[in-house]
Amino acid sequence: DETANVKRAAQRVAWGKGINCGQTCVAPDYFLVHENVVDDLVKQLDECFHQYYGADILACDEWPHMINRHHFDRVMGLIENRNPNARVAFGGRGDAETLRIEPTCLTGVTLDDPVMGEEIFGPVLPVLTYRTLDEAFDIVRTFEKPLACYVFSDDKQVQHRVLTGLQFGGATVNDVVIHLANNHMGFGGVGNSGMGAYHGKVGFDCFTHYKSTLKKGTWIEMPIRNPPFGDKINLLRMLMR
């Protein structure tokens, strides 16, 4: 939200999106930004990517490439097939020889754009804006429950509302991705993003079948539970209340 440290948010989102150039299941998929800080955020993102990967990112040996030509073409198509009012704030170029695509930020995106219709799994970051937190929630709930949610805010009430008011697999506050690196916390999805969780004790429990077992002695029998019941029915009903 508008209380967030915009520079830190840009640094950390650029880092998380840059891991395998967005080809991870927990990469930031889209950025929902308060309208008062969106211009600053986009500017800072552009600067961060170039700080990390140099002036010509397509020529940077540390910038990963797409897994194959099919996905290169798919992601380039998401950039090119945007609505007429959407624009490439930075990036947008691809090299079919190396299968590299520049970190690309799209602004003016609508929920009907192809880039919002699938998991991107590439270095494209659409930016949507909101005015109120309720409006932001409505946008998030348009989609299936995500595997990860990242909230950047210095307002603890906003953090609490996001963490308790939305459904997602796991979350990080004021950073991205790193929640899954903690082996003491479960990692997994909910609904369309997955079932169950693993890591540490949570993983042990997930892949363990706990057999419910009851052991009884044989020194006495309870005739009240055995037929014929007759007048015992009323007593049984009292005991079962």
Model-derived regions: residue spans:
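ALDH superfamily catalytic-core signature
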Residues: 1-110, 173, 235, 240-241
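Conserved C-terminal structural/oligomerization subdomain of aldehyde/semialdehyde dehydrogenase
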Residues: 100-241
